[in-house]
Regions:
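An N-terminus-focused feature that recognizes amino-terminal "leader" regions
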Residues: 1-27, 203, 208-212
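Negatively charged, low-complexity tracts enriched in Asp/Glu with abundant Ser/Thr
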Residues: 59, 71, 76-100
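Short, solvent-exposed interaction modules
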Residues: 87-157
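Mixed-charge, glycine-accented linear interaction segment located at domain edges/termini
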Residues: 134-214
């Protein structure tokens, strides 16, 4: 899996005992794949991964984040929140995989629940941003959205601190690869850039439609 992941890697940003990497393996389903991992170097080789959260951002939302970063809007919002001591997210994405889909692909949770995933972009203290990724049990509501049911105790939790520059590199390099993929798709004469039906196999873990908050 590590070799496959490195082959798909666009960019990786490291923090203390953790990293986030952007992967190009989900453009065909309209998603930008961010993998958050935490590790413990004191563990034996091959057992060092402590937490892993897979986040799939809608490609349109990634482009909107890029627009806000390039226009200076994101910086202004960050400065305003820091001046006011506002710790609420600058951006939040809630998604996951339903219990039914997990069962269908042979990855049911032991508790039979859905898998909830949350990504948040928060104002940092010592740096510009905190990127927070959590996953744990969830429930599917009547609208088909995955509602988290882990409170303040997620099963997997990864936090990475990034400067404005490093976060923009993550965004803009991912956008560059996505736009290159779109160009290649159209140049091959593909009728549509995205699959009209959900593929049988989705990289790593499939996602239900996600709800984002800017």
């Amino acid at each position: 899996m590590d070799k496959e992941r490195n082959a798909h890697q666009i960019v990786r940003k490291d923090g203390k005992g953790c990293f986030v990497e952007s992967l190009n393996d989900s453009f065909s389903i309209g998603r930008c794949h961010l993998a958050f991992a935490a590790y413990d170097l004191n563990r034996p080789a091959g057992e060092r991964q402590a937490n892993l959260v897979q986040i799939y951002l809608d490609c349109g939302e990634l482009l909107e984040l890029c627009r806000k970063a390039e226009s200076g809007e994101l910086l202004l919002r960050l400065q305003d929140k820091k001046q006011k001591g506002d710790k609420t997210p600058l951006y939040q994405c809630m998604g996951g995989t339903s219990a039914e889909k997990l069962h269908r692909i042979g990855r049911p949770r032991p508790d039979g629940k859905s898998l909830s995933r949350i990504f948040q972009l928060l104002p940092g203290n010592k740096s510009d941003f905190l990127l927070v990724a959590d996953s744990g049990p969830g429930e599917t509501d009547e609208k088909g959205l995955i509602v988290p049911r882990f409170g303040k105790q997620p099963e997997n939790h990864v936090v990475i601190s990034l400067s404005m520059g490093h976060f923009c590199e993550l965004l803009l390099l991912t956008r560059a690869h996505y736009l290159a993929w779109l160009t290649a798709s159209y140049s091959r004469g593909e009728e549509k850039a995205f699959h009209t039906q959900e593929p049988e196999q989705i990289p790593t873990e499939p996602q239900e439609p996600e709800m984002a908050m800017f």
